[in-house]
Amino acid sequence: MEIIARLANLPGALPGACAQGLIWGIMAIGVYLTYRILDVADLTVDGSFGTGGAVCVMCLLSGQNVWVSLLMALLAGLLSGFVTGVLHTFMGIPAILAGILTQLSLYSINLKIMGKANQAINVDKYNLLISLRWVKEFALHNPIVMIIIVTAVLIGILYWFFGTELGCAIRATGSNPAMSRAQGINTNFNIVLGLAGSNGLVALSGALLSQYQGFADVGMGRGAIVIGLAAVIIGEALFSRIFHNFALKMVSVSLGAIIYYIVIQLVLTLGFDANLLKLLSASVVAVFLAVPYWKGKYFSKPVKKAKEDAKNA
């Protein structure tokens, strides 16, 4: 009976879970660009996510328009990714280590931007784009509606960009760097550009989350890469057979983030210890990463020897 009583509270918490999933879905699309398109493991996102939130809140507190604040957060993320790209390509530092170095630096930079560990922003005093307060309202300014619009616009822009000559060159760089160089493509430039664009999206997501929750925190991006990977992997596992188009693949990533947060909300509603959430997230990512390997090793149909002999004949 206690479980049923807990589950009765779940519908009231679903709008908030969906809103958070949509916000983190934008971050997950950024992770998708590096993880799947560039084939680069970028850990900068744990820092650039917080940078986006810090820049956005401080711009709003200084009296800037909400759109200007979001743009400044986006530019801060672009710069963060650019630094990681330069460390990796120009200085020859491995991508993972370059991301860690930038992430570590951004912690201090975020503290310097805000002046302290966190900064609050009141929806009653500032004109915010989204807020947790409106999540259950049936109106245009509902965060779910606003983030769906923002996500649709971003996916449309990315779909167009990756269909251009430059976008195709970036995709070719991630798919086959050696062949790309043989075709005269500047792979280093494309890697830097891809990392910058990815972290720009991550910072934009952080800016939106800071508005939604009403504050920016120096540690708000901690574990962001795990959430991003979880969204990517869940989206691919559930929708890969349905969504083949590049734009729809990005939609699946966003849906993966929503599903992730709904599952997290369900687990919390059932009384799971909130202190173990990071452990749960890491376990989910590990299992979904292992599924393709398990399928290939333990569940693939063995090739009959007769067929092999026929091919070799």
Where are these regions (language model features)?
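Short, non-helical or kinked segments that cap or interrupt transmembrane helices
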Residues: T34-G52, L87-L101, L166-A169, L193, ...
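Cytosolic-side transmembrane-helix boundaries in multi-pass membrane proteins
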Residues: S175-A182, N186-F189, L248-V251, V263-A313
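Helix-loop-helix "hairpin" substructures at the membrane interface of multi-pass membrane proteins
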Residues: S80, L140-I225
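Transmembrane alpha-helical segments in multi-pass inner-membrane proteins
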Residues: V202, G206-K278
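Transmembrane helix-bundle core of multi-pass membrane transporters
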Residues: A95, G99, Q103-G163, L193, ...
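Alpha-helical transmembrane segments within multi-pass membrane transporters and channels
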Residues: Q64-L104, I109, A152, L255-G256, ...
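Membrane-embedded helix boundary and interhelical linker motif in transport proteins
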Residues: Y35-F90, K136-L140, I242, T269
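Membrane-interfacial amphipathic/re-entrant helices at transmembrane-helix boundaries
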Residues: M1-M27, V55, G63-V68, L140-H141
